[in-house]
Amino acid sequence: MSLVGGFPHHPVVHHEGYPFAAAAAAAAAAAASRCSHEENPYFHGWLIGHPEMSPPDYSMALSYSPEYASGAAGLDHSHYGGVPPGAGPPGLGGPRPVKRRGTANRKERRRTQSINSAFAELRECIPNVPADTKLSKIKTLRLATSYIAYLMDLLAKDDQNGEAEAFKAEIKKTDVKEEKRKKELNEILKSTVSSNDKKTKGRTGWPQHVWALELKQ
């Protein structure tokens, strides 16, 4: 019985019919000398107490050894043109970060909702809007600026009899078409105010023909 392996074994007998047995045993002994007892104790015990092996058995044992398997894995990557794990550039080895589009979509929805709510509040401030009229954002802005100009004109006429001067905001002239539209609107407003001397109480109304002029734009 062997003291190292713990199993009974036969003494090593060299047969002349297997000329590769001596070379295989020498290669196995050289491999065992490179390995420590702590790393591979089973292989060391097997090397001391193993029976004589034939060349086919020895080739089969090498195919199942860890060193041979690791070497074969490396050869397999190089054979198929692949790159072993961790051998590529440092920035390309890990998984690609996934873009979080959900957060961007939620921010965009909140921004759109805030803009729509602001335009809805602005439409409520414009008087005499027909119920069947659907105003776009650009028409809402145009009507709002026209209504502001209308209110400023009323305030200027009311302050002519007072001591303090009315506050006037200067608006830059953009183009000829816009200037012409403002002149027509001012003429219509002047004719409307001159025909109606009574001052309206509460919310100031807006004539319907002004709406007709604005909606044609």
Curated annotation (Swiss-Prot):
Main location group: nucleus
Biased composition (Basic residues): 97-112
Annotated segments matching region Disordered: 76-116
UniProt keyword annotation of Protein biosynthesis present: no
Domain bHLH: residue ranges: 99-151
Keywords for this protein: Angiogenesis, Developmental protein, Differentiation, DNA-binding, Nucleus, Transcription, Transcription regulation
GO biological process: adult heart development; angiogenesis; apoptotic process; apoptotic process involved in heart morphogenesis; cardiac muscle cell differentiation; cardiac neural crest cell development involved in outflow tract morphogenesis; cardiac neural crest cell migration involved in outflow tract morphogenesis; cardiac right ventricle formation
UniProt subcellular location: Nucleus
This protein's GO CC annotations: chromatin; nucleoplasm; nucleus; transcription regulator complex
Tissue: Heart and aorta.
Comp. bias intervals (Gly residues): 83-94
Presence of keyword Kinase: no
MF-aspect GO terms: DNA-binding transcription activator activity, RNA polymerase II-specific; DNA-binding transcription factor activity; DNA-binding transcription factor activity, RNA polymerase II-specific; E-box binding; minor groove of adenine-thymine-rich DNA binding; protein homodimerization activity; RNA polymerase II-specific DNA-binding transcription factor binding; sequence-specific DNA binding
Role played: Essential for cardiac morphogenesis, particularly for the formation of the right ventricle and of the aortic arch arteries. Required for vascular development and regulation of angiogenesis, possibly through a VEGF signaling pathway. Also plays an important role in limb development, particularly in the establishment of anterior-posterior polarization, acting as an upstream regulator of sonic hedgehog (SHH) induction in the limb bud. Is involved in the development of branchial arches, which give rise to unique structures in the head and neck. Binds DNA on E-box consensus sequence 5'-CANNTG-3'.
Self-association state and partner proteins as the record states: Efficient DNA binding requires dimerization with another bHLH protein. Forms homodimers and heterodimers with TCF3 gene products E12 and E47, HAND1 and HEY1, HEY2 and HEYL (hairy-related transcription factors).
Name this protein carries in UniProt: Heart- and neural crest derivatives-expressed protein 2
Annotated source species: Mus musculus (Mouse)
